[in-house]
UniProtKB/Swiss-Prot annotation:
GO MF, one example: GTPase activity
Domain of life: Archaea
Pfam families membership: MeaB
Protein's name in the database: Putative GTPase AF_1289
PANTHER family linked: LAO_AO TRANSPORT SYSTEM ATPASE (PTHR43087:SF1), LYSINE/ARGININE/ORNITHINE TRANSPORT SYSTEM KINASE (PTHR43087)
Source taxonomy: Archaea, Methanobacteriati, Methanobacteriota, Archaeoglobi, Archaeoglobales
Role played: May have GTPase activity. May also bind and hydrolyze ATP. May function as chaperone.
EC annotation from Swiss-Prot or TrEMBL: 3.6.-.-
Length: 346
């Protein structure tokens, strides 16, 4: 299919066209850029909600129950679940249907036109997201979903990248996994707009909740010191980026028992309240402006790297580097000069 045919189908509500567009984008087919160009002006209406947390905290069940709750509220829901990639194929290991086990009415939900589910492989990428997550979010947005839920891979590494695609970041924890370690690790004190203590029927839930509320009450200087001690995303914490992005908003802490549906309504309420707050204060425009800037720089960098590989003698310079005949800085300058020179030739 031609890009314009896919876009026409997607914008008219054709789910097959949406699925094909996602496949093109995820696999970086040549047509994908034209698809993204054509749908860009149709985006910016959906509320993108990211759920992140360590393995086993129940993110998938929360996503399932939240989907049910938002559907009850008349919202159309798109779901992106980032799976760990196969080290051999790069493909998602879990697959779409396994991720919806927590839903009560599976048959109905699989045929519900107001729900679309897609799993994506992280392909070994750190940060909890797949490389093309942002583009797939835009496709779901253009299709007309009201809420887009993005569930990170949950591999235990720093997953602060969720803030690069989400309007609202939900950090999920659970008891009996070392509450202080959970709270101190991976910059999660800085990235969350909402915090969830799931599996709250287990012992220790109140302790996690108290500790979390205490840590969230600390001032910016204290958290910056904490980030140094815990090896969080220190550069971004020290820059004040995380605090600036939620200034004026006090993150709530919500206890849930997702597999029984307890606390789901309160969580959905908090998610909607946060979205309303951002729209009212102008924070949503600020976050999205930063997101577009990062995206622009990433596209430029990818295109420049492609030019370097195609239009310069970087391989010869690599050989010289390995022989000690030049240094990385001089080699980089030569590559930049080559790129500029070749660009001037048209």
């Amino acid at each position: 299919m031609k890009p314009e045919e896919i876009v026409e189908g997607l914008l008219s509500g054709n789910r097959r066209a949406l699925a094909r567009a996602i496949t093109y984008v995820e696999n970086e087919y040549p047509e994908s850029k034209e698809i993204m160009r054509q749908i860009f002006a149709k985006t910016g209406r959906a509320h993108v909600v990211g759920l992140t947390g360590f393995p086993g905290v129940g993110k998938s069940t929360l996503v399932s129950k939240l989907t049910e709750e938002f559907r009850r509220r008349g919202k159309k829901v798109g779901i992106i679940a980032i799976d760990p990639g196969s080290p051999f194929t790069g493909g998602a290991l879990l697959g779409d249907r396994l991720r919806l086990d927590g839903m009560d009415s599976r048959k109905q939900l699989w045929t519900d036109p107001g729900i679309f589910f897609r799993s994506m492989s992280s392909r070994g990428r750190a940060g909890g997201l797949a490389a093309k997550t942002g583009d797939v979010v835009r496709l779901l947005d253009a299709f007309g979903f009201d809420v887009i839920l993005v569930e990170t891979v949950g591999a235990g590494q720093s997953e602060v990248d969720i803030i690069e695609v989400a309007d609202t970041s939900v950090v999920v924890m659970m008891p009996e996994t070392g509450d202080e370690i959970q709270v101190n690790k991976a910059g999660i004190l800085e990235i969350g707009d909402i915090y969830v203590v799931n599996k709250a029927d287990l012992g220790g839930a109140e302790k996690v909740e108290r500790w979390l509320r205490y840590m969230l009450s600390l001032d910016e200087e204290s958290v910056q010191m904490l980030s140094q001690m815990t090896h969080a995303d220190e550069a971004r914490v020290q820059s004040g980026e995380f605090f600036e992005r939620r200034k004026g908003w006090n993150p709530p802490v919500i206890k849930t028992v997702a597999d029984r549906g307890e606390g789901i309504k309160e969580l959905a309420d908090a998610i909607e309240e946060h979205f309303d707050y951002m729209k009212k204060t102008g924070l949503i425009e600020k976050r999205r402006r930063e997101r577009v800037k990062r995206e622009l720089f990433e596209i430029v960098m990818n295109d420049v790297i492609k030019l370097v590989k195609e239009k310069t003698n970087y391989r010869d310079l690599l050989v010289k580097l390995l022989k000690g005949e030049t240094d990385p800085y001089t080699a980089a300058e030569q590559i930049v000069e080559e790129v500029i020179h070749n660009a001037g030739k048209g």
